[in-house]
């Protein structure tokens, strides 16, 4: 059995562990966050939602995910 290395990512202020080669898209899906009406910030820079499949996370990254909800 292969042991995967883990990395620490702070997601919305909460420290979490993930496999070391995780991409932003996979993390968002793992957390069951819908991709429509969402803004993602990685280390204080907004990620273009069209490019999240290509963005790999690194140890000690800080990710902020904001999901917009309609209403009045």
Which ranges hold each PLM region?
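Ubiquitin-like/PB1-type beta-grasp interaction modules and other compact soluble beta-rich domains
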Residues: 1-71
């Amino acid at each position: 059995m292969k042991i995967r290395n883990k990395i620490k990512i702070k997601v919305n202020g909460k420290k979490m562990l993930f496999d070391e080669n995780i991409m932003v898209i996979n993390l968002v899906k793992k957390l069951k966050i819908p991709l429509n009406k969402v803004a993602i910030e990685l280390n204080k820079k907004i990620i273009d939602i069209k490019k999240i499949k290509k963005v790999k996370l690194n140890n000690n990254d800080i990710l902020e995910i904001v999901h917009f909800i309609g209403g009045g």
